[in-house]
């Protein structure tokens, strides 16, 4: 559940953005198209890298051990 303070912040955020004038950002430079494309491409590469690492780690954990073919009488679920 979201705390009440965060809900109030989210509700007042559009009001605050409507009060700002365009170009009122001090110290903000415009992003060139190659820089923006590079940021998007880098984000996609890092996201794919995270997906691959998670997939490999999950696959390594789900490999059966060598003792899975043994039958244990006193262990339910193994025989």
Curated annotation (Swiss-Prot):
Q: Which GO terms describe its molecular function?
A: phosphatidylinositol 3-kinase binding; signaling receptor binding
- Per the record, residues carrying Phosphotyrosine are 72
Query: Which regions face the Extracellular side of the membrane?
Result: 19-35
Q: Where is the signal peptide?
A: 1-18
Quote the InterPro entries the UniProt record gives: HCST
The record's similarity note reads: Belongs to the DAP10 family.
- The protein's name is Hematopoietic cell signal transducer
In its UniProt entry, the species of origin is given as Bos taurus
Upper taxonomic classification of the species?
A: Eukaryota, Metazoa, Chordata, Craniata, Vertebrata
- Whichever gene encodes this chain, its name is HCST
